[in-house]
Curated annotation (Swiss-Prot):
Specifically expressed in developing vascular endothelial cells. This is Tyrosine-protein kinase receptor Tie-1. Disulfide bonds join 226-235, 229-242, 244-253, 317-325, 319-331, 333-342. It comes from Bos taurus. Belongs to the protein kinase superfamily. Tyr protein kinase family. Tie subfamily. Keywords: Angiogenesis, ATP-binding, Cell membrane, Disulfide bond, EGF-like domain, Glycoprotein, Immunoglobulin domain, Kinase, Membrane, Nucleotide-binding, Phosphoprotein, Receptor, Repeat, Signal, Transferase, Transmembrane, Transmembrane helix, Tyrosine-protein kinase. Residues 212-254, 256-301, 303-343 form the EGF-like domain. The active site is at residue 977. PROSITE patterns: EGF_1, EGF_2, EGF_3, FN3, PROTEIN_KINASE_ATP, PROTEIN_KINASE_DOM, PROTEIN_KINASE_TYR.
Amino acid sequence: MVWLEPPLLLPIFFLASHVGAAVDLTLLADLRLTEPQRFFLTCVSGEAGAGRGSDAWGPPLLLEKDDRIVRTPRPWQPPHIARNGSSRVTVRGFSQPSDLVGVFSCVGGGGTRVLYVHNSPGAHLLPDKVTHTVNKGDTAVLSARVRKEKQTDVIWKSNGSYFYTLDRHEAQDGQFLLQLPNVQPSSSGIYSATYLEASPLGSAFFRLIVRGCEAGRWGQDCTKECPGCLHGGVCHDQDGECVCPPGFTGTRCEQACREGRFGQSCQEQCPGTSGCRGLTFCLPDPYGCSCGSGWRGSQCQEACAPGRFGADCHLQCQCQNGGTCDRFSGCVCPSGWHGMHCEKSDRIPQILDMVSELEFNLDTMPRINCAAAGNPFPVRGSMELRKPDGTVLLSTKAIVEPDRTTAEFEVPRLALGDSGLWECRVSTSGGQDSRRFRINVKVPPVPLTAPRLLAKQSRQLVVSPLVSFSGDGPIASVRLHYRPQDSTMAWSTIVVDPSENVTLMNLRPKTGYSVRVQLSRPGEGGEGAWGPPTLMTTDCPEPLLKPWLEGWHVEGPDRLRVSWSLPPVPGPLVGDGFLLRLWDGARGQERRENVSSPQARTALLTGLTPGTYYQLDVRLYHCTLLGPASPAARVLLPPSGPPAPRHLHAQALSDSEIQLMWQRPEAAAGPISKYIVEVQVAGGSGDPLWMDVDRPEETSTIVRGLNASTRYLFRVRASVQGPGDWSNVVEQSTLGNGLQIEGPVQEIHAAEEGLDQQLVLAVVGSVSATCLTILAALLTLACIRKSCLHRRRTFTYQSGSGEETILQFSSGTLTLTRRPKPQPEPLNYPVLEWEDITFEDLIGEGNFGQVIRAMIKKDGLKMNAAIKMLKEYASENDHRDFAGELEVLCKLGHHPNIINLLGACENRGYLYIAIEYAPYGNLLDFLRKSRVLETDPAFAREHGTASTLSSRQLLRFASDAANGMQYLSEKQFIHRDLAARNVLVGENLASKIADFGLSRGEEVYVKKTMGRLPVRWMAIESLNYSVYTTKSDVWSFGVLLWEIVSLGGTPYCGMTCAELYEKLPQAYRMEQPRNCDDEVYELMRQCWRDRPYERPPFAQIALQLGRMLEARKAYVNMSLFENFTYAGIDATAEEA
């Protein structure tokens, strides 16, 4: 039950129910039960789909009590509302008699409102008749009967305001009369008669309905003639249809329902066994309220007097030719006679079973049948069909049956002007009869806008077919036609649901497709013309080949040469080049190298960091699409070596020996493992010879096996974990007999066999030492990795309450052991088995984490999911925030506007969190991709729009986010990083709050640690004092709303963070976007108020945005108005 407050406007009483008389809506009041607890009101709709509550069918049935005129105390206990199916709602269980006095209404489809006025049975004055329906210009007389006389004057009010006063001596036969001459539609409303100084509950309440035309007329200018409604039916002043009283039906209310039935098709039945006794029926205006057929009296419990029938027993039978009067249906004629008064003989022809209304589509040529009986029997030439303009159509065929003749008329192609009342006439020697019926010519729907492209892949297009259209509904089917651009091949067609996005499958890559929508309504010829075309282009074909790394080698301290290969493939290679990725896990840095030639199989990477372990992979790319990555390899770039040895000099000892001497390098980073000596013949063309000095404490060596009388060049370098810089080059000649032989040292053999053996031993020793060094390094790395794995299974983090917490994973639980407390607190989470996760594509990654799309199996069902995981070298702080996010997700529970937890899995000491997969990515990128003036200017100018998203869709994003934040605030969680980048777009374009890594579960959170801050989204108190509350999130929501309206613009674009710190406390705020409605901008300003307690709560924000959605107003203007420009984007500023 809805109670309308006094401040609302009054004209709803006499205007709202004029929305459409054709609506089958009835409000019943049970007057048999005088106790408030047993009294009930029932609202019944006979419309198809009534009360389903969707956009297609309108709002659900609603029962309201209006206290704006008859103000009564609020009930101490609200009445009970019960719904029986989708087309009936009942309210009962009122607390006290005063709860019943006043105006009740039933609101149905299309906003049609039916009113009922209830008078107190114990009032001083009672109305002789509650509802009065009169014509424009008539004189209305309202009669208040005295039940309990008072010696005071009587005040008449109209719509709660003083209208007239009658002296107490002006009563006539115990009645006070109010005459209203020459009434107009503005005279309609609620009237009341009250003794002076008496309680309003003792008043007599009336409802006056004034038709907009004079008697027998209807239409905007009241020039059309009413059809002549029978049995007390009232002609609607707007569309000329008869509003039939309860118990009668038909175009002119000519047919009586069976006893106890009502509704436009007699489909409803009165409750109980006593028929419709004691029930008041209220119908759409201009009918009003009355008793059911066969009953009269203030409580509708008195049967009609003999000779009377119908609603309120207003009709007289006046039966002829032996007919008898039935108080429910009128005259019951004997055999051989028919008509309202049994005045027509059966010899007179009679139209049989003629429907009251038909509907056809424009430009169709339907066949209409008309059946008649009589004596003599009607033949084809005796029947004709008349159009509204008077044109006469003759039947083309007649089917004669024992009890009737059915004539078939072929109607020429229908035009809009053919809508109206048609008439079937039959004429024989026994007389004539006619029956009028209405034909409605409907215009097939035609789309006004083209479908919208939401996402694209190489072989798929995601399309939103929801379009505005001209013509008539309802929409029976939506067809999507598409084919390649400039193609002569046949169109492909699929039937789609207009409320859901559709994916066009099996398309050709990098191909433009023309896409059009066709709408259809029910009936033959209901297919409308195709809507305007739009061009949608598929993405490039994704590369499918997976490269593999052939090898790599270090070419310098910061240079790495990488080579790879591809599997053989027939035909041309699909790809534009290769992307090499080097991931430095220790520093959280990624290096990407683009090789622009698809024929390249090697690349030199420079500028690397010595002494770093890199994870290396390579993948093929085509356009913007990446192929599968090669198996990753772990590459160590040796650390930079020590400085060069000092003061190198050489001395010839013999014709085959030279001694080298040097000093240790200065500030070597670690113990020197060996020295490396380079020997080369001066001026020779051969490669140099290297030899190792494996005893690092020695700073001299003798080079043997040299050629006599030959000049040599020498240099030395030291090695710690890798070789260092070379020393200066020195030159020295061996002793000899004057002969000088040039050539590679490796090609000259020493004369003495012992010297050769010493050189071989030196080389073997050097190789052995190197192998031992590599083995020791591998063992050390294995120990370090084992230690890291152990550390990741159990570690500590600082929780939101400030307590140091130990996290331990086990099957299905995350144990948070807070050190000040002796007992652990296990946090349960839905368990996913490692075998039930199939990893697919990398969605995104940051410095320390990755998000991978995966297919998971949960409760026996396969579903898409996004798997969040930390990288191998994430810090303990990262593990802390990651586990904290799982804790937040577990405590939050499920809500349609947040990214919900699907489960978690622990494998080999690593935690994997599975959350809902959002197929359209984050809201920021989604908004920026919709800037169609930048991506497709021709489309934008052709359709006059700046975005592929409508105003309603943008407002829906904001409403969804507000609902999600309301849920977080009710759970007492503070997000702290609310922005469009942290809102994801899920199925049906629903926005979902995401990224709870910074969320906290306190009412106030004070940040005590350092870290990068989202300054442009932060509230003043957060910037100045590092204090975060739900009201701080409200500030951020205002910035998010600005991002949505600006299609992903950068907040405060062009300003530095330092300027923000200075200007925000000085009341500076972002300006109103030109495409933004004042109401939306005012909501932003409310979120940006200086004092947190003055900002609206999320519940109020969600309610306000919900009302904007229901208003269906373009709050965000996406039209290309003059000098339209998008809000600026500064990616570097968004990082701060």
